[in-house]
Amino acid sequence: MNFPQNVKYTNEHEWIRLEGDVAYVGITDYAQEQLGDIVFVDIPTEGETLEAGEVFGTIEVVKTISDLFLPVAGEVVEQNPALEENPELVNKDPYGEGWLIKMKPANAADLDNLLDAEGYKAVVNA
């Protein structure tokens, strides 16, 4: 299982990586492995400002639909257009081409309250 050091993690298995004033958000390798084959990603919140922990979309696998939770407060500015035709990118490359949204965090310092790779490993292995 992959635990990149350059991202922050949530207990709900999302990750966030800040690049300038925009952050990429996705689900973790552990989450995609537990979910199985992803068949559809729905992000209806593009352009909306949400609070940390609010649902920003859903991921559909063969047997279930799972909510996606925003790691920090901010505006959802873009969804990954590649996922419309290729939702399996989330399974193949969850920290790269399989990112879900780009967002503008309301306060970048909020990322400091999230888990680092070691903290997230402890959650997964608990």
UniProtKB/Swiss-Prot annotation:
Chain positions with N6-lipoyllysine modification: K63
Any Gene Ontology biological process: glycine decarboxylation via glycine cleavage system
Keywords assigned by UniProt, alphabetized: Lipoyl
Tree of life domain: Bacteria
Required cofactor names: (R)-lipoate
Manner of cofactor binding, per the entry note: Binds 1 lipoyl cofactor covalently.
Job description of the protein: The glycine cleavage system catalyzes the degradation of glycine. The H protein shuttles the methylamine group of glycine from the P protein to the T protein.
PANTHER family linked: GLYCINE CLEAVAGE SYSTEM H PROTEIN, GLYCINE CLEAVAGE SYSTEM H PROTEIN-RELATED
Protein name stated in the entry: Glycine cleavage system H protein
Taxonomic source organism: Bacteroides fragilis (strain ATCC 25285 / DSM 2151 / CCUG 4856 / JCM 11019 / LMG 10263 / NCTC 9343 / Onslow / VPI 2553 / EN-2)
